[in-house]
A protein has these predicted regions:
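Intrinsic-disorder-associated, low-complexity terminal segments enriched in Asp/Asn/His/Tyr and depleted
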Residues: 10-13, 17
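The catalytic Nudix box helix
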Residues: 310-344
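Short, contiguous pre-domain boundary segments
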Residues: 24, 28-50, 69-70
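NUDIX/MutT-family hydrolases
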Residues: 361-412
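N-terminal strand-loop-strand
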Residues: 254, 264-309, 338-341, 363-364
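Catalytic cores of DNA base-excision repair glycosylases
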Residues: 32, 53-55, 59-60, 64-249, ...
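Active-site segment of metal-dependent pyrophosphate-handling enzymes
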Residues: 181, 279-283, 288, 330-368
Length: 419
């Protein structure tokens, strides 16, 4: 029998990484580590064009990284498994949150065999709260593939890495260079920003010509035999110094930076077209029957495939949220329900959507004959359960539904307020 997942609030940080990450200076909304001062950070009148001084630029960057690298747990040994997990976790996730999840993950799945032997339910539960759950399912599929086709040894060849589920060009480059020190340039948003400023890339970085130029420059500035340090240094510099609010006085590349020399740092990178934000009104309901509540397991397709949830869906034009939750329950389960109380609104977002989740307490509409509820007719799920509220913690749920589930057992009772 596998050990049960640790309860919320009992998570461990065995090596104190989270505490180390929190030992920082705070600037505005950003938390930044204390950086080693850089001499000559403000460029002298004689700007040193980066194309003509690549060895100096490389040395300055590596020296800065050696002095300022954050104590991240996957940097202790650079094992392929740990590098891979960290790279997947940090997609769409802030660093401090990623470190916390990484440490918990390693307690539960310390190596490839442990992950490959896990069930999808266990993996999704460990991933809960990070979102984009296809990443977790791909991790499990890739781990099993490595065990079956590579004898349990994570491949070092970039083509073999790229063939694993859920691994794209960036993650391939990151694993190849950071885990195996292969001469492959990593390009993420941080690297794009650094290169766009140092080399004055004057068009949106995601456009074809700019992307090609950045890729070519990233390869050119990669020092021989130092891919691991260099790629991490570029990403670290973009995260800590060359951010949206640049700290040019702390930058080791200031004397090489063309945008700084021209006084246009805040104009680089050139912004692309912003994605439009779409608001969505969604409903869900907690259907109670005596001391148990109804949950269902989503179909395997989609962003939250395979997760447990309270049934619900979008509010259609002309509907009130109360009408929508009654309709959704009828469509998804066959149950006829009525709203007994509002539980509040949970606000959250994903990709370009901003969601308001209206939550309601529900009861079955039946005659007065006491009997168990009829079995549901599921149209949007593969399974369902009637559970005591305390049992909900064992299920993997989307973040908003987890917030609702946790509120049901909170000392103050259900939400009864808007988040």
């Amino acid at each position: 029998m596998r050990p049960s997942p640790p309860r919320r609030g009992d998570r461990k940080d065995p090596r104190g990484y989270t505490a180390a990450m929190r030992s920082r200076q705070t600037t505005g909304q950003h938390t930044l580590p204390s950086l080693v001062p850089v001499t000559g950070a403000v460029p002298p009148p004689g700007h040193r064009p980066p194309e003509d001084h690549l060895p100096e630029l490389q040395q300055a960057l590596l020296a800065w990284f050696d002095a300022n690298a954050r104590p991240l747990p996957w940097r202790r040994h650079y094992t392929p498994y740990e590098v891979w997990i960290s790279e997947i976790m940090l997609q769409q996730t802030q660093m401090e949150r990623g470190v916390s999840y990484f440490l918990r993950w390693m307690e539960r799945f310390p190596d490839l065999p442990a992950l490959a032997a896990a069930s999808e339910e266990e993996v999704l539960h460990a991933w809960e709260g990070l979102g984009y759950y296809s990443r977790a399912r791909n991790l499990l599929a890739a781990a099993r593939l490595v065990m079956q086709e590579h004898g349990g040894v994570f491949p070092s060849d970039p083509e073999a890495i790229r063939a694993l589920p859920g691994i794209g060009p960036y993650t391939t480059a990151a694993i190849a260079s950071i885990a195996f020190n292969l001469p492959v340039a990593c390009i993420d948003a941080n690297v794009e920003r650094v290169i766009a400023r140092v080399f004055d890339v004057d068009s949106p970085v995601k456009s074809g010509p700019a992307a090609a130029r950045i890729a070519e420059l990233a390869r050119r500035i990669l020092p021989e035999g130092e891919a691991r340090r260099h790629n991490q240094a570029m990403m670290e510099l973009g995260a800590l110094v060359c951010g949206k609010k640049p700290r040019c006085g702390q930058c080791p590349l200031a004397r090489f930076c063309t945008a700084l020399h021209l006084g246009i740092v805040h104009e680089r990178p050139v912004p692309g077209k912003k994605a439009e934000i779409t608001p969505i009104e969604v409903v869900t309901g907690v259907l109670s029957n005596h001391d148990r509540v109804f949950v269902q397991k989503r179909l395997p397709q989609g962003a939250w495939g395979g997760l447990w949830e309270f049934p619900g869906g979008r509010v259609e034009p002309g509907e009130t949220p109360e009408q929508a939750v009654v309709r959704e329950f009828a469509e998804e389960t066959g149950f006829t329900v009525r709203v007994t109380a509002p539980l509040g609104i949970i606000r959250h977002g994903y990709t370009t959507y901003r969601v308001r989740l209206h939550c309601f307490a529900l009861e079955l509409v039946t005659d007065d004959t006491p009997r168990p509820p009829e079995p549901p007719v599921l149209t949007a799920a593969t399974a369902c359960r009637w559970l005591e509220r305390g049992e909900l913690e064992s299920l993997a749920m989307p973040a908003a539904h987890r917030k609702l589930a946790d509120s049901l057992t909170a000392p103050k009772g259900p939400l009864l307020t808007a988040f």
